[in-house]
Amino acid sequence: VDRRQRQMCIRDSLEAPVQYAFRLDDQEIPVNPLIGKSLRLEYLGAIHCTHCGRKTKTSFSQGYCYPCMQKLAQCDICIMSPERCHYDAGTCREPSWGEQFCMTDHVVYLANSSGVKVGITRGTQVPTRWLDQGASQALPILRVATRQQSGFVEDLLRSQVADKTNWRALLKGDAAPVDLAAVRDQLFDSCGEGLLELQQRFGLQAIQPLSDQQPVEIAYPIEAYPAKITSFNLDKNPIAEGTLIGIKGQYLMFDTGVINIRKYTAYQLAVYA
């Protein structure tokens, strides 16, 4: 199969194991059947902004040209640090976008990828966010009214648990199972005073515990883990190829190295299978 296209990303769905597909322009190609087979990705030398389509020499914020990175709300610092939201100050880059994506219910969750971490995502992005991170377990623990408020909650909880994934550990093997419900209960106990203060500030309905949720177990299509974690860099070498041995999160794992497909979302690639 020879597929050439402008932009590529991975679409995933929560099944056992997770099902992946390359989204190639207007079509999708299942990737799970390619595991165990030879696969080649070739960067064709062009990058097109995922927002405006402009050709750019460099991809900013994983897929944008520099002008869009500077003007779009989705590229602002508050996306990575939601507690720094400045919508109320009247300085949001795109107020209508902020109303749609930030002034809506968010879920605070625990996930086990390379170890237990706390994270946030829009309610509509469950379970996609967990699959993107390569989590083997996940548990929603709070429903919060806005993105900024979820950022305040995350900031409180990360004093007790990590908020980052160790991608090298993620690709070395399965994380040891964790009792996420017990971790949730411990967090609610140790951070109870801080959570109460946030509820008093924003209202009881704004920050609601999800104590009845059950952990989700997630399995990925992996034949084997790489013997050595070597990352392909298409900017230095335009070809990534080898036998595809597994997929986890946004990573394709070959017997020759690994590649984070999200990093190359705006790149024009050719796929040979």
Listing of model-derived features with the role each one plays in the protein:
Residues 34-90:
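Cys/His-rich short segments
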Residues 258-271:
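A short macromolecule-binding patch
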Residues 1-10:
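Single conserved hydrophobic/aromatic residue that forms the stacking wall/gate
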Residues 95-97, 216-236:
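Short boundary/loop segments of OB/S1/cold-shock single-stranded nucleic-acid-binding domains
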Residues 97-161:
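Compact nucleic-acid interaction/catalytic patches
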Residues 105-109, 249-254:
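Short aromatic-glycine-enriched beta-strand elements
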Residues 20, 26-33:
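Phosphate/adenylate-binding glycine loop and adjacent helical scaffold
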Residues 159-214:
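Long, charge-rich alpha-helical interaction segments
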